[in-house]
Amino acid sequence: MPPAHHGSGGRRRPGRGNKGKRDTEAGMTASPDPGYMRPETHAAPSQQTDVRSPASAREHRNADVGVAAPDALTPNAGEQKEVEGVAKVNVAVSSDQPPDWAPSQSDLPPSLSPTTASRPATSSRSPRARSRHSPVASSSAFSSPAPSASALTSASGVPEAPLAAPELKHTLAADEGNPEPRLEGPVERLHARQENPLTDSSDGSYILLEEGESQRACLDRKNRHLRQTTPPGVWTTADLASQNSHSASFASGFRRALLPSGGSGDHDEQASDCRASLRGMQRPCFGSPSTDTRMGAAEGLPLASRRRRQHWRRELRAFGAVALACLRASWHGMKRARLRATRWIDRNAATVRVACYTFLLLVTSTGNTICFKKMIDKMPNYSPCLTQVTTVVFVPVFFALSLYTDYAGGLPQEMADFPKRNFAVMGFLDSFSGVMAIIGAVHTTGTTQVVLQQSCIVFSLLASIVMLRKRFHAAHYLGALVIILGVLVVKLPDLLHPSSDGGGDVFVFNLLYLLSNLPTAVSCVYKEVAFRGVEMGTNYLQAWVALFQFLIGFLVLPLNALPVLGPQRVPLAELPASLWNGTRCLFGFNTIVTNCGGAGNMESPCDNCEGAWKYVGMYLSFNLLYNMFIIFVVKSGGAALTFLVSTLRLPVTALAFCSRAIMGDRAVPPKATDFYGLLVLILGLVIYRAGGIMKRRAQRRAVAAARGHTSSPMMLTPREEEQIGTIFVEEVFAAGELEDGGVTEEDETDDDTSEVEVHPVFSSVVASEPPHVYVHTKRHSHSDGGYHKLPACGSSPAAFTPFTQRMPGTGSESCSRRRNRDGDDERSPRSHACSFDEETGFAGGTGTGRHFSSPGTALSPNRVGGYEPPSMHAVQPAVIGKSRANNGCI
C-alpha cells in the first residue's frame, strides 16, 4: 500500500534511511478482507500554505458545505428519525459500561443532553471525520459525511444515505457567534469507540486500528517530551489526529499510511478551527503554528520559511556552543599561565623583588621630578615657604621610624656617641642646596632641570678628589667631560641666541639651579668621611639631618633677597610676611593679584593658589617613596642599579615634560638640541660607569701581582679569592703594600667580600642620582669606649698585628702579640698557633713563611713596644682633608 502524504509534515527530506522500512511495513499491513479498498494515491501536497484568516476560513468551509450537500441543510423528519434509530442500535451493540477514560454525565456541560451525547458527531471540523482513511472510523458511521465512492454500511449491510447535517449547521453557527468552547471532539471519540469495538470485523480494518494504536503508544513512549499531557480532572478538546500528526513528523511508512493525507493548507485550517474551538480556554491548542514551538514558525509562514528559521536557530546554538568552548579553553589557559607564573616567581623571588624595586624607583624618581616642577609653578612667589614646608614634614616621619627601628631594641652606644655637630654640618649643606634649587626652578623649564641635574656627578668627582684625595680611572674623567659637553649642547644655543620671551628659561635662575648641585655633592662626600668606621642607622641619620636642615633653613632664607633675582627678590624685611602669605596660598588664598604677570619676566607672576596643597602633597608623597625605594634597591640589588635608574630617568622625564597631557600649559615644546643633548649625557654616564669597572679590574690585577699569583687575575673566581686571600689581606694591609685609591661600586655592594657598605640618605630636593653615603667595615668596640676599624688604606694597629719571630735558643717560630687589650703579653709556643682575632678578623699567623723587615711596617720592632689606643689609628669623623703620613690616605 503506497503511503499517503502527511497533512502537516510536508515533504520528507532525502537521506532519512527508512524508505525500505516504509515499503516493508506497507506490505505487512495489507488487509486480508477482499472488501477493503486501498486508499487512492494523491498528488504531493503543495509547498505553499494557504494563508487565511479565521473568518475567510469559515467562509471557505461554508462554501464547501453548500456545494457538497445543498439540500442537506433542510432534512425531513423521516431522515432524522432514521438517523436516531441507527444511533440507538449502535449504542445497544456497544458494551454496557463505558471505558474508564469516558467522562461521566456530570462532567459534560448542560448544553449536551444524553441524547446529544449518544448521537454520532458529524462535524466536519474533525480530521478523522473529514478523511475516509482514518483507522478510528474503520467500519462505522464515522466516515466522511460528504458523498464519496465508499458508502456507509449499517448493521444489516444496506448502504445508507449520507448523514444529514443539522449538527453541522448548528456547529457553524456556534462557531460564528457562540464564544463557548466546543466539546464535540471527546464526545466523537467516545461514540467512535463505543460503536466500533475490536470485535467489529465487518471489513477487517480493526487490524489497522490495533496496530496503529500500538505504534502510536510506542512512539509516545519514545518521545515523551513531544506529548501534551492533560492534567487529571481537566477536560480539554485535544485533537487526537493533530497530536499524532505532529508527534510523528518523521514516522515510518506504516505510520504515515495510517495518518490522514492532505495539503499544507489543511494544517492551517485545522489550527484555525482549533483556536476557534478553544476560544476562552486557558490551555492553548496543541499543534497550532502559533503555539507549536517544535515547528519553530509563526502563523502563516510557509514551510520553507519555517525550515530556514530552524536552520538559523541551529546555527545560533552551534555558534553559542563554539563560543562557550573557546571561553572555557581561555579560562583553563589563563589558570595554567597563572600557575606557571606563580611557580616561576617562587623560584626567582629575589630577582622579581629587585626588578619590582628598580621599576618603582624609576617611577617614583620620575614622578618626584615632575611634581617638583608642578609645585614650583603653582607657588612661584613663595620659595621661602616651600623650602621650609618640604623639610619640616619629614622630621616627625623619620623620628617615628627611628623610634620604631632603633630605640625599640635599645639605641646602640655608637650611634648615641656620634657627634651631633656632624649632623648640623650635613643639615646646613642640604638646606643651602634646597634653597638654591627652589629659587632657580622658578624660571627653569623641566627639560633644562633634567639636564642640569647631571652636573652633580661632575661636582662629586671634584669633591672626592679635593676632600678624599681619591684617584680615579681615566674613564671617569672622560665621562665627566662628556657630561659637561651634553649640558653645553642643550644650553649653548640659548646662551648665544636668547629669545625675547626666554622660553621659560632665565640664565640667572638656570645658573642658581646648576650651582645647587655643588652643596649636594659636598654633603655626600662629607657623609662618607663622617661615617667612616661608624655603623649608623639610616632612619636615625635622616631624622637628625632633616631637623637641622629645617632649623638652619631659617638662617639660609636671606638668599631670597639677592638683587640678581629681579622680580622674585624678597627683601629681608618681608621674609616673615612671605612665609605667612605662602602658608595662606598653600590653603588656596591668593595674595599677589595686582602689579603682576607682566611680559618678559619683568614682574612676578600672579597668585593661582587654588588646589596648591594637592601639588605640594603629591611632591612630598613621591619624595618619601623615592627615598624609601632607594633603600630597598641598594639593599637588594646594589648601588649599580641606582646608576641604571638615573640613566633611564633622563629620556623618560624629558618626554614627560614635553607631554601636554602631563604638564598641561607648562609643557615644553621639544627641540632638536634637547634630544641631542640627552644622547650625549647618556653616553657620558655610560663612560663614567665603565671607568668604575676598569678601576676594579686594575685593583684585582694589583692584588694578584702582590699575591704572586701566576694565573690571569681576570680568571679568578670568588671561591679562589676567598681561599687564597684569607691571610693575604692581613699581610697586605699590615705591610702597607697596597693603596686603596677608592672603592668601586661593585665592591661596595658585595655583601660577602666588600669593605664598604652603601647607605642611602634623605634628600628633600631633586638630585641627579640617589644620594648615599659609604659606611666602611664594621665597628670594633674596645674597653676605652672608642671605636676602631681597619682603614681601607692604612696599616693595622700594633696591638692587633700578629707577626712571626724566632724564639731565643730554639729553632721554632712562635706567634706573638706584644700587648693585648689588657696590656698582657700573649704568646704561643707552636708555630702559626695564634688565635683568631674575632674583632679584627685577622688570623693567628701570616701563614706564608715570609718575614717583612722594612721599617715602618707592622712587623717592625718599634711598632710593638706597647698598647696604642685604637683612636690614634682610626679616621676621626670631624677631620676632613688631612692625609695619613705613611701612605697619603685620610
Curated annotation (Swiss-Prot):
Main location group: membrane
Membrane topology: Multi-pass membrane protein
Biased composition (Low complexity): 102-126, 134-156
Stretches that traverse the bilayer: 350-372, 392-412, 423-443, 448-468, 472-492, 506-526, 545-565, 615-634, 641-663, 674-694
Chain ranges on the Vacuolar side, renumbered to this chain: 373-391, 444-447, 493-505, 566-614, 664-673
Miscellaneous notes: Can function as a drug transporter. Can transport chloroquine.
Name assigned to this protein: Chloroquine resistance transporter
Source organism: Toxoplasma gondii
